């Protein structure tokens, strides 16, 4: 139905349309009244958030939560903090500084955030956060408390009174042995200089003896247990270490040292004139005066096959004992009356080895109560040639030579005889 209304005029009989009030044009000077649009109800929309916690520079396994949006614009950091406080306790989120992962140019970066900052999604509605552990302001102002709370603690900081006297630690020098090919011992066993000199000397001797082939254990005489104890003040500024000379390396198959070379070296050491006990302390001689197994073996086989021509000056002029390379040990000069006393002196200076009644060697190398059976016999021509070179010898010389060849036991009868002569 049309809204127009026709009316008749008296002048002319035709109809004129009439406009309604709704369609009347308003004047342009009149302002329109703005009415506020209706607010849509806010729906509790949740978005997924993945966050990492960084402790000591390492990222933990990722955590997943759902955060409710408080604004239509998107996610804010305060929404995440409120959610973490509800789930993991109040103050948990304040222990970390938060940053969000976002795209930047052709890659991704961590965008540091404050509490009121907007969080940009990575892709679509994907949010990734990282929480880095922060230090408290009181810990930063007090560095001592920072050291106590850190995971790497100094044990001396826990007891400052105990460690105030010895602030300077003992110096420990370590030496790497590069000449051993079979066994690679990276470090020697070392001891601090704060120990007493007696204890450190015993430990060094024990450690050195375990690294040699001398495994035998013998009961030490009472005289050898008495040692001079030096003042510990002379060892204050010295570091105790085992050098390469003090430890004999383990034997190897490729070692050029043969049995003959070892015996010659022992011959040079043993056949010297009588000196002080400190002069004989070498690699083959222990500090207590006893000898190594190689030196004892040299004494057993020295009266026959091995030659000592290359051992240097071996003539003992003071005692009257001379060694011949082929014939063994013979007494060349000396009075016949005190022959036994001279032999005793020679045996005491010959290596200074004193055998006891209960003393034994590893492997039962020698038994003092049994006679040694010669393994090899010389031919008659060799014996004749040797006799022609040596010249005539008396029976006394032969008896004394045989007596000097063997290693006697403890000279008890001689001592008793001397005591009887003095009384």
Swiss-Prot record:
Q: Which UniProt keywords apply?
A: Cell cycle, Cell division, Cell membrane, Developmental protein, Membrane
Q: Which GO terms describe its biological process?
A: cell division; plant organ morphogenesis; protein polymerization; regulation of cell division; regulation of root morphogenesis; specification of plant organ axis polarity
Source species, domain of life: Eukaryota
Query: What cellular-component terms does GO give this entry?
Result: plasma membrane
The Swiss-Prot or TrEMBL note on domains reads: The DIX-like oligomerization domain is required for polymerization, edge localization and biological activity.
Describe, as the record does, how this protein assembles with itself and its partners.
Homodimer. Forms long polymer filaments with other SOKs proteins polymers (e.g. SOK1, SOK2, SOK3 and SOK4) crucial for polar localization and biological activity. Binds to ANGUSTIFOLIA (AN).
Q: What is this protein called?
A: Protein SOSEKI 5
The primary gene name is SOK5
């Amino acid at each position: 139905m049309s809204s127009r209304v026709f009316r008749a005029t008296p002048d002319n009989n035709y109809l004129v349309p009439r406009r309604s009030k709704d369609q009347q044009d308003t004047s342009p000077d009149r302002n329109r009244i703005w009415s506020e649009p209706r607010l849509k109800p806010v729906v509790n929309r949740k978005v997924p958030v993945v966050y990492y916690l960084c402790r000591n520079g390492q990222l933990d396994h990722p955590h997943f939560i759902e955060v409710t949006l408080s604004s239509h614009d998107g996610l804010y950091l305060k929404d995440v903090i409120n959610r973490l406080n509800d789930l993991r306790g109040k103050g948990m989120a304040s222990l970390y500084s938060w940053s969000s992962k976002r795209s930047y140019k052709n890659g991704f970066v961590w965008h540091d955030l404050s509490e009121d900052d907007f969080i940009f999604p990575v892709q679509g509605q994907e949010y990734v956060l990282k929480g880095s552990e922060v230090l408290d302001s009181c810990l930063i102002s007090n560095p001592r408390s920072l050291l106590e709370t850190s995971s790497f603690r100094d044990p001396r900081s826990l007891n400052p009174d105990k460690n105030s006297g010895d602030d300077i630690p003992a110096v420990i020098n370590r030496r790497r042995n590069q000449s051993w090919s079979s066994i690679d011992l990276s470090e020697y066993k070392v001891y601090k200089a704060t120990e007493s000199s007696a204890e450190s000397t015993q430990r060094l001797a024990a450690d050195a003896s375990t690294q040699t082939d001398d495994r035998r254990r013998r009961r030490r005489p009472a005289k050898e247990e008495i040692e001079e104890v030096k003042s510990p003040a002379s060892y204050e500024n010295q570091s105790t270490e085992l050098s390469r000379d003090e430890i004999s390396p383990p034997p190897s198959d490729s070692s050029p040292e043969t049995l003959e070379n070892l015996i010659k070296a022992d011959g040079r050491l043993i056949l010297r004139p009588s000196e002080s006990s400190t002069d004989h302390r070498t690699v083959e001689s222990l500090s207590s005066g006893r000898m190594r197994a190689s030196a004892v073996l040299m004494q057993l086989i020295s009266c026959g096959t091995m030659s000592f021509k290359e051992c240097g000056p071996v003539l003992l002029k003071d005692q009257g004992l001379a060694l011949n390379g082929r014939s063994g040990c013979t007494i060349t000069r000396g009075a016949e009356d005190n022959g036994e006393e001279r032999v005793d002196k020679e045996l005491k200076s010959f290596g200074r080895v004193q055998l006891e009644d209960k003393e034994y060697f590893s492997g039962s190398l020698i038994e003092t109560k049994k006679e040694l059976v010669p393994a090899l016999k010389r031919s008659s021509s060799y014996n004749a040639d040797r006799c022609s070179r040596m010249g005539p010898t008396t029976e006394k010389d032969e008896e004394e030579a045989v007596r000097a060849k063997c290693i006697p036991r403890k000279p008890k009868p001689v001592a008793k005889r001397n005591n009887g002569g003095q009384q």
